[in-house]
Amino acid sequence: MPGIVELPSLEDLKVQEVKVSSSVLKAAAHHYGAQCDKPNKEFMLCRWEEKDPRRCLEEGKLVNQCALEFFRQIKRHCAEPFTEYWTCIDYSGLQLFRRCRKQQAQFDECVLDKLGWVRPDLGDLSKVTKVKTDRPLPENPYHSRARPEPNPEVEGDLKPARHGSRLFFWTM
């Protein structure tokens, strides 16, 4: 029925949350974007194609899982330089990167040495890319409505209007 909305169960929605502050997210954003690029783009493609977040729960869980694993690796290998970096960002008035370049360099060096991750260049993560996915195409990717039936043929002779055109300013 079109009026009934099926909601996912609480078990479908249950995932471990990424409990970090905005400063931590901002400090980790460049490396997170590079490491979790594929699950994030798969999720955004699903959201764009399906136009219904309920159909993208599995992709959302993969994004969450990738973020959790990313922060676990940072905590395991580079906790101290990362803490210094995000604390500096947190205490700089507007969460600006430019005031924390020294801590950023230490964090980037640690991540490169211990995890082999290179900080992406400016603009690398915002480039338009094609996403290869295993998901099937949605049935109606453009969410277009069914075409209406064409107008029926007019039967009989059509006579011109008795008083001319209805557009009075053309008939003056």
Curated annotation (Swiss-Prot):
Q: Which family is this sequence assigned to?
A: Belongs to the complex I NDUFA8 subunit family.
Oligomeric and partner information: Complex I is composed of 45 different subunits.
**PROSITE patterns, per the entry:** CHCH
The free-text function statement in the UniProt record for this protein reads: Accessory subunit of the mitochondrial membrane respiratory chain NADH dehydrogenase (Complex I), that is believed not to be involved in catalysis. Complex I functions in the transfer of electrons from NADH to the respiratory chain. The immediate electron acceptor for the enzyme is believed to be ubiquinone.
Gene Ontology terms: biological process: mitochondrial electron transport, NADH to ubiquinone
Classification via InterPro entries? CHCH, NDUFA8
Its subcellular locations are: Mitochondrion inner membrane; Mitochondrion intermembrane space; Mitochondrion
**Gene encoding it?**
NDUFA8
Question: Which UniProt keyword terms apply here?
Answer: Disulfide bond, Electron transport, Membrane, Mitochondrion, Mitochondrion inner membrane, Repeat, Respiratory chain, Transport
Stretches the record annotates as Disordered? 133-159
Please give the GO cellular component terms listed in this UniProt entry: mitochondrial inner membrane; mitochondrial intermembrane space; mitochondrion; respiratory chain complex I
Which Pfam families does this one have?
Answer: CHCH
Free-text note on domains in this protein's UniProt record: Contains four C-X9-C motifs that are predicted to form a helix-coil-helix structure, permitting the formation of intramolecular disulfide bonds.
Residues in a coiled coil are none
Motif Cx9C motif 4 boundaries: 100-110
What sequence ranges are listed for the domain CHCH?
Answer: 33-74, 75-118
Sequence ranges of Basic and acidic residues compositional bias: 146-159
Q: What is this protein's name?
A: NADH dehydrogenase [ubiquinone] 1 alpha subcomplex subunit 8
Sequence motif Cx9C motif 2, location on chain: 56-66
Q: Which organism is it from?
A: Bos taurus
